[in-house]
Amino acid sequence: MNALSIPTWMVHVSSVIEWIVAIALVSRYATKAGYGHWRALAWGMVPALVSATCACTWHFFDNASQLDWLVTLQALTTVIGNITLCLAAWWIYRQSAQPSAPKP
């Protein structure tokens, strides 16, 4: 656990917490506002959360060489996360551009 300084740990852990809170808030917004297509954004954020968790786990175990596969998994989930976030943004744009029926 000594691989990172305390301020760097604070950044890593707060990033994971930030992703969790953001996913929860976006999901809640989708439900409360009735915009189900926003839920795609919440799901699109999950791979980025997995990526951040991989980084924290690897550093927690002092960058152990036995856990080098976590670095590969982090890279993969970062790419997947970037793609899913892009697709979610496109989906939200597409749904928002369609004329909607008036709400009662």
Swiss-Prot record:
Name the UniProt key words of this record, in alphabetical order: Cell membrane, Membrane, Transmembrane, Transmembrane helix
Bilayer topology reads: Multi-pass membrane protein
Keyword Lyase on this protein?
no
The superkingdom listed in its UniProt entry is: Bacteria
List the GO cellular component terms.
plasma membrane
Q: Which residues cross the membrane?
A: 6-26, 41-61, 73-93
Q: Where in the cell is it found?
A: Cell membrane
Q: Does the keyword Membrane apply?
A: yes
Which Pfam families has this protein been placed in? DUF2499
Name of the featured protein: Ycf49-like protein
The text of the family note is: Belongs to the ycf49 family.
